Amino acid sequence: MASFLDTIDRALVIAPHPDDEVLGCGGTIARLTALGREVHVAVMTRGTAPRFDPASADAVRAEALEAHALLGVAETHWHDFPAAELDRVAHADLNKAMQDIVGRIAPDTLFLPFVGDIHLDHQLVFNSAMVAARPRSPVYPVRIYAYETMSETNWNAPGITACFQPNVFVDISRFAAAKAAAFGCFTSQVQSFPSERSQEALAALARFRGATVYREAAEAFMLLREVG
């Protein structure tokens, strides 16, 4: 059966922090790279002192590289905006960084964190990415999806803030194990169940999203825009 994934040649996944890309898109990344597609990941922030231990920031980046290697990511692009403090960064600076990475990679498909996530970094990254992806530029992604991030998307306020209502589902039945292995690389981030950042919670969400469309496991997205 044909899939919309067949139309993707080069994808860019924007992650506010290391591991967001695996939580939201790990199975889809693995499926795309198995098809021979080119997938890039841009991580927009870095933990800085005094809020974060610099050694911990280095460790989580090393974990991310290990996870990305497992998933077949073509290249990881690091930015050093302060984690949990993006609201202190000039919006124009974040816009410029996003425009630069989108222009340099020239993806046909963009995966973004959801604007309704409770973490302000996610909201700001979403907004800047949408600025960078405007179709008035010479190079722009023709399709944009928002992904869900356990521990962020699920803490919105329904009816008050934007609610994640997926309309695209990617069958990751054959890639759920790869996603779990990639998440397992983040030893500094994985927590025990019933935390949302546990292997059990991640698997439960994949099974629920899969059952929604009669699949064993799936990742859910919102299609934000497609230009044909």
Predicted feature locations:
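Generic hydrophobic, amphipathic alpha-helix propensity
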Residues: T45, V60-A64
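Active-site phosphate/pyrophosphate- and oxyanion-stabilizing loops and adjacent acidic/basic residues
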Residues: A30, L65, P166
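A structural preference for short, hydrophobic beta-strand core positions in alpha/beta folds
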Residues: V41, H77-D80
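A polyanion-binding, active-site-adjacent surface
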Residues: A64-L65, F81
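Metal-dependent de-N-acetylase/amidase catalytic core
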Residues: M1-I14, L35, A55-D58, A69, ...
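ATP-dependent adenylation/pyrophosphate-handling site
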Residues: I8-P18, V22-A55
